[in-house]
């Protein structure tokens, strides 16, 4: 499959079809179009890629990368998603020009599902699955992290909900 974007109704290919590729998030900053996704270069696992005005930059090796969020300001990017770690765990991550930060340490299966940035704070949402091997009970939960630290969410039942997306709004409390 060819990774492409549409601008004013016209498709613009990001790849030539020699690989399997996809775009999962787009963002415009300073007139520059950013598209984040993944590409299977050699038929193995997905490799994370950021296209800047159509030019690719790879931000992971072939580690089963899935992108679910992109934020760009003044040319600096934050990409959110998940990848398969060396241990085989699926972990939620953010990638910047400085490298990768694993957000979901200690969780065997946690998919990133949303990214929001408010000022200098980075919020990431995810869906996690685990197993209580004593009772063989499946455990599902949806953590939200602020700057890499998991936040407590007020919910009626913490074992029966998922988070697919995240948004931040500023509320001016000063009059």
Please place each PLM-identified region on the residue numbering.
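Residue-level hotspots at or immediately adjacent to binding/recognition sites across diverse folds
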Residues: 1-175
């Amino acid at each position: 499959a060819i990774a492409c974007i549409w601008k004013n109704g016209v498709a613009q290919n990001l790849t030539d079809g020699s690989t399997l590729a996809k775009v999962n998030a787009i963002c415009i900053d300073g007139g520059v179009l950013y598209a984040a996704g993944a590409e299977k270069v050699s038929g193995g696992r997905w490799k994370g890629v950021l296209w800047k005005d159509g030019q690719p930059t790879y931000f992971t090796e072939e580690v089963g990368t899935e992108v679910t969020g992109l934020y760009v300001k003044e040319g600096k990017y934050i990409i959110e998603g998940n990848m398969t770690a060396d241990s085989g765990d699926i972990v939620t991550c953010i990638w910047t020009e400085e490298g990768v930060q694993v957000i979901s340490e200690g969780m065997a299966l946690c998919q990133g599902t949303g990214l929001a940035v408010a000022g200098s704070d980075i919020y990431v949402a995810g869906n996690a699955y685990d197993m209580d091997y004593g009772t063989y009970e499946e455990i599902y939960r949806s953590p939200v992290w602020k700057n890499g630290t998991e936040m407590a969410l007020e919910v009626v039942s913490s074992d029966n909900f998922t988070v697919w997306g995240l948004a931040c709004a500023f509320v001016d409390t000063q009059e």
